[in-house]
Amino acid sequence: MNARRKKRLALATALIGGVAAIASLLLYALNSNLNLFYTPTEIVHGKKDTGVKPEIGQRIRVGGMVTVGSLVRDPESLHVEFAVHDAAGGEVMVTYDDLLPDLFREGQGIVAQGVLIEGGKLEATEVLAKHDENYMPPEVAEAMGQTHEKLEYDSTQKTGY
């Protein structure tokens, strides 16, 4: 092989290697920023199609209804814990260390975004609540199958305390 062909081969090899390295770094960056939506049942039992569960430490969003009677507030801080369930019976505990949205109530649809820290526990970085009694995020509405029942609230539940 002459010198000219060796240079071309080295250049082509370096170019292919560089493109492969850039592609792998790009895919890694995209994978670490993915924020997949799961229902509580999918977190506990895995996806219906594949049975795949989210991994511990994975950033996810979970949507469902806040279980009535599950809200526990720490009187000394902003820390709250509550359970989120869906129509299929799955339930996930959510912990959150910030102010909850004004419209957050037990029995209401929410979407919590955060990191899965145990099999059935999410450490939320953001909690989103619906903005009126008829609205529900599309993912939650689909996951719940619109089978939830409207709850009647007493005065303490309406104030959130």
Swiss-Prot record:
A molecular function (GO) term: heme binding
Designated gene of the protein: ccmE
Family assignment from sequence similarity: Belongs to the CcmE/CycJ family.
Principal localisation: membrane
Periplasmic side: 30-161
Task of the protein: Heme chaperone required for the biogenesis of c-type cytochromes. Transiently binds heme delivered by CcmC and transfers the heme to apo-cytochromes in a process facilitated by CcmF and CcmH.
Coiled-coil parts of chain: none
Transmembrane segments: 9-29
BP-aspect Gene Ontology terms: cytochrome complex assembly
Ranges facing Cytoplasmic side: 1-8
Protein name from the UniProt record: Cytochrome c-type biogenesis protein CcmE
Membrane protein topology class: Single-pass type II membrane protein
GO cellular component: a single term: plasma membrane
InterPro entries, A to Z: CcmE, CcmE-like_sf, NA-bd_OB-fold
Binding site for heme: H131, Y135
Subcellular location: Cell inner membrane
Sorted UniProt keywords: Cell inner membrane, Cell membrane, Cytochrome c-type biogenesis, Heme, Iron, Membrane, Metal-binding, Signal-anchor, Transmembrane, Transmembrane helix
